[in-house]
């Protein structure tokens, strides 16, 4: 039986009928008409704190030090700002990212000069790649010492120039204006990182504070309103397509466009794929959702992109992990590419219809045109759906028991998602645990899935979960981490314990660097060079004892029959962080897989099992 032209949304209540969550607050400073303050004489440091208060900042993640210490003195008196004293500046950066990702607001981190600032660099690069709005405030040596190799001097502006949207070195007393400009740049257009570096003598000197300051950014005018002619061209291509796909990226979440996306999808009946950064932008339970594309995506999602005749790319950047070998990606497809960042249009794949603008406005205008022209009812995609349904039913996401009888990590993560449910926030590390969490947890709402997608930064999960919990204290927040990632930033659990931030950690402990080991298995003749972290049955460290030493509850699980009980036990503890060490086998692997640098046509559903697409036969090379 052929599939209908468009699949109706389920009428019955339940998981499939969950409505999208209301949009989170926009990534911008506090709304409303600003009150006027001043002018009054204050120190530069006081002007920083006053400015952050007026910008609506709620929490700062940071560590004091010599050059930034003047800021920490007036911070002591603030009744509006909460400071979270992290254990490492990288943790401050990732926590600010987690806060921003979970709330849609600008995250703030703070560090001193030199090593304090350079310790933020990894987190800065991570947030920049994933379009997370964060402002980093750093102290700098005095102006007369800059360039003299003074104690704890580092050219953080020069270092971060390639990995921030904009950075400021404040050499005269205009802290309020600079901070307001940094927040505006970070939150508008394509969200990203901004860095504000302030010399110590500027912080200690006197200045005149008044609010709101005058923002002077004559060269910064991001395009948000799409061109109507481009939208009409796009509507014509959609009406003519026979194998269209909505290729959805993280920009749909950043742009608060999930409701508009659902309206467009249901209006047209077009299948939807959501990238790693877009999980939750469209409900997993929806009949039109084919899952995640890319290196470890579903076979149906990969097949849909490869065999499509029209890619409707929304807020996505055609990343190599999605396209595979670029010159073989979706070879017959025309491309409509909508993105707020003009630099992304045509960067990796030529766009037949380029659209620069806010994705929410783009989709809304497209829906209006399609409704007016009556195009949705004329789409002839029944055969396309029949093909995709067949692929999806033949190659569903699945997993089997571990060959050594050990606890399966996929089972653990799937059960966690079922028990904690779609209202919880899931924050992943990088590698196996990240991919399994993207595959086997059902995401129904935006901003419930946080991960390091572009940089793939190990150590992201624990501090980012801490930041997410600070921003969404009512939500249940789970960090899903491997033992390799966990050992890079687990010290922030002490921060959580001291600050009263009760995150929960599902630690997938296989005793090795799992994703690297998988590549060694597949491509390096099982030569496991420097990937063993210690046997999981006799781990170093003992993660239960480590968790307890850091002020958390430590739990351990080795058997499948105990998984549900231990997860429920962790959920019942809400006065401190909880770490569950799930002891899993060393050789669990992530499938499906497209090997790096190869065509998506070479996808393997499982090791040695390569699907045959519609134009292939047995023996096709």
Swiss-Prot record:
Cofactor: how and how many bound: Binds 1 Mg(2+) ion per subunit.
Keyword tRNA-binding attached: no
Coiled coil: none
Keywords, in A-Z order: Amino-acid biosynthesis, Branched-chain amino acid biosynthesis, FAD, Flavoprotein, Magnesium, Metal-binding, Thiamine pyrophosphate, Transferase
GO biological process, one term: isoleucine biosynthetic process
Region (Disordered): 1-39
Molecular function terms, GO-annotated: acetolactate synthase activity; flavin adenine dinucleotide binding; magnesium ion binding; thiamine pyrophosphate binding
Phosphoprotein found in the keyword field: no
Annotated EC: 2.2.1.6
Catalytic activity: 2 pyruvate + H(+) = (2S)-2-acetolactate + CO2
Binding-site residues, Mg(2+): 483, 510
Amino-acid positions noted as binding FAD in the UniProt annotation, renumbered to this chain: 190, 296-317, 339-358
Binding site for thiamine diphosphate: 89
UniProt pathway: Amino-acid biosynthesis; L-isoleucine biosynthesis; L-isoleucine from 2-oxobutanoate: step 1/4; Amino-acid biosynthesis; L-valine biosynthesis; L-valine from pyruvate: step 1/4
Domain of life: Bacteria
Region of interest (Thiamine pyrophosphate binding), ranges: 432-512
GO cellular component terms, semicolon-separated: acetolactate synthase complex
Cofactor requirements of the protein: Mg(2+); thiamine diphosphate
UniProt enzyme class: transferase
Family: Belongs to the TPP enzyme family.
Name assigned to this protein: Acetolactate synthase
Organism listed in the record: Mycobacterium avium
Gene assigned in the entry: ilvB
């Amino acid at each position: 039986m052929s599939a209908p032209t468009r699949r109706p949304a389920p009428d019955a209540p339940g998981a499939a009928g969950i409505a999208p969550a209301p949009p989170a607050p926009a990534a911008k400073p506090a709304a409303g008409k600003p009150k006027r303050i001043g002018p009054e004489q204050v120190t530069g440091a006081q002007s920083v704190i006053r400015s952050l208060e007026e910008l609506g900042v709620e929490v700062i993640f940071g560590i004091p030090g010599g050059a930034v210490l003047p800021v920490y003195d007036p911070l002591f008196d603030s009744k509006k700002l909460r400071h979270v004293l992290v254990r490492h500046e990288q943790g401050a950066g990732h926590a600010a990212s987690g806060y921003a990702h979970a709330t849609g607001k600008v995250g703030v981190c703070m560090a001193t000069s030199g090593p304090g600032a350079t310790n933020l660099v990894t987190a800065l690069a991570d947030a920049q790649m994933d379009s997370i709005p964060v402002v980093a405030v750093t102290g700098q040596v005095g102006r007369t010492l800059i360039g003299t190799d003074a104690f704890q001097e580092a050219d953080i502006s020069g270092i971060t120039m390639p990995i921030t949207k904009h950075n400021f070195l404040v050499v005269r007393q205009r802290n309020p204006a600079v901070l307001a400009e940094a927040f505006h740049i970070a939150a508008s257009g394509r969200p990203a990182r901004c860095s504000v570096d302030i010399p110590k003598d500027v912080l200690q000197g006197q200045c005149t504070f008044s609010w709101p300051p005058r923002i002077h950014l004559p060269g910064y005018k991001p395009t948000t309103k799409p061109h109507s002619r481009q939208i009409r061209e796009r509507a014509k291509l959609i009406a003519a397509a026979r194998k269209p796909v909505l290729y959805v990226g993280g920009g749909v979440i950043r742009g608060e466009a999930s409701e508009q996306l659902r309206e467009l999808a249901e209006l047209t009946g077009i299948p939807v794929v959501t990238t790693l950064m877009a999980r939750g932008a469209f409900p997993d339970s929806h009949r039109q959702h084919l899952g995640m594309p890319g290196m470890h995506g579903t076979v149906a999602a990969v097949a849909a992109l490869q065999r499509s005749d029209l890619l409707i790319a929304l807020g996505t950047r055609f990343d190599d992990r999605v396209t595979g070998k670029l010159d073989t990606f979706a070879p017959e497809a025309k491309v409509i590419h909508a993105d707020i960042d003009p630099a992304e249009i045509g960067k990796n794949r030529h766009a037949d219809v380029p659209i620069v603008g806010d994705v929410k406005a783009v989709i809304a205008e497209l829906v209006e045109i399609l409704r007016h022209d009556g195009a949705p009812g004329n789409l002839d995609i029944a055969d396309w759906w029949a093909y995709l349904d067949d692929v999806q039913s033949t190659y569903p996401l699945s997993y089997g028991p571990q060959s050594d009888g050990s606890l399966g990590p996929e089972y653990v993560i799937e059960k966690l998602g079922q028990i904690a449910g779609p209202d919880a926030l899931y924050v992943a590390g990088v590698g196996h645990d990240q991919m399994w969490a993207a595959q086997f947890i059902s995401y129904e709402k935006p901003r419930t899935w946080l991960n390091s997608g572009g940089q793939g930064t190990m150590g992201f999960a624990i501090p980012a979960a801490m930041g997410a919990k600070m921003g969404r204290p009512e939500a249940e927040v789970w960090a899903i981490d491997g033992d390799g990632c966990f050992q890079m930033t687990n010290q922030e659990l002490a921060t959580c314990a001291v600050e009263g931030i009760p995150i929960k950690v599902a630690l997938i402990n296989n005793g090795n660097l799992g994703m690297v080991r998988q590549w060694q298995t597949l491509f390096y003749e099982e030569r496991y060079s420097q990937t063993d972290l210690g046997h999981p049955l006799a781990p170093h460290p003992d993660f239960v004892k480590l968790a307890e030493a850091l002020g958390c509850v430590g739990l351990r699980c080795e058997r499948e029959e105990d998984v549900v009980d231990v997860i429920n036990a962790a959920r019942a503890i809400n006065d401190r962080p909880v770490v569950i060490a799930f002891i899993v086998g060393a050789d669990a692997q992530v499938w499906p897989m497209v090997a790096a640098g190869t065509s998506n046509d070479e996808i393997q559903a499982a090791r040695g099992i390569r699907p045959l697409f519609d134009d292939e036969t047995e023996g096709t090379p």
